[in-house]
Amino acid sequence: MPKETYSVTTPIYYVNAAPHLGTAYTTIAADTVTRYQRANGKDVALVTGMDEHGQKVADTAADHGMEPQAWCDSMEPAFRDAWEALDIQYTDFVRTTEPRHALTVQQFWQKLYDKGYLYKGAYEGWYCVHEETYYAESDLEKNEDGHLVCPDCKRPVQLMASGEENWFFKLSEFQQPLLDFYAAHPDFIMPETRRNEIVS
């Protein structure tokens, strides 16, 4: 009889900095769950890796006088060596610049498009590159110079407004099925404060 399968993933870590206590903590937690499930006889896959896209990565590469791909390539050993030093037993290490990742994303997007779950639109908002988050103007703070800053990291934010079209996911198509699922499985999103945030 085949073993029951179980999947564990870490975030795919941004390569704007070397692994640190936060990345180690998260990866150790994922590895602990993996070992526990393996000890219970399951066939477990633990996937980790690097997210090599984003403005933060491009800015960090430029700060080091490197092209983004060269910077990302230089960071891979730091992550692999850190996980080896911590005896992390991952089964796959994914890089978002790998051809296999690009192909998977293209296939996934095509399925969403074919099912009508994507639509084009424009987005405008205040963006913090460091936090990689958009904020409503009412959520921002002003620094001593009167400039709008991120409420979390206190760095300046940028108004991202362009006529550029973006693709959006029709989450509204799934609203009721998701709410029904969360009601039937109240422990699916933890802690409760995060569940309440999602369902409100």
PLM feature segments, named:
Residues 1-200:
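N-terminal, positively charged nucleic-acid-binding surface of large information/translation enzymes
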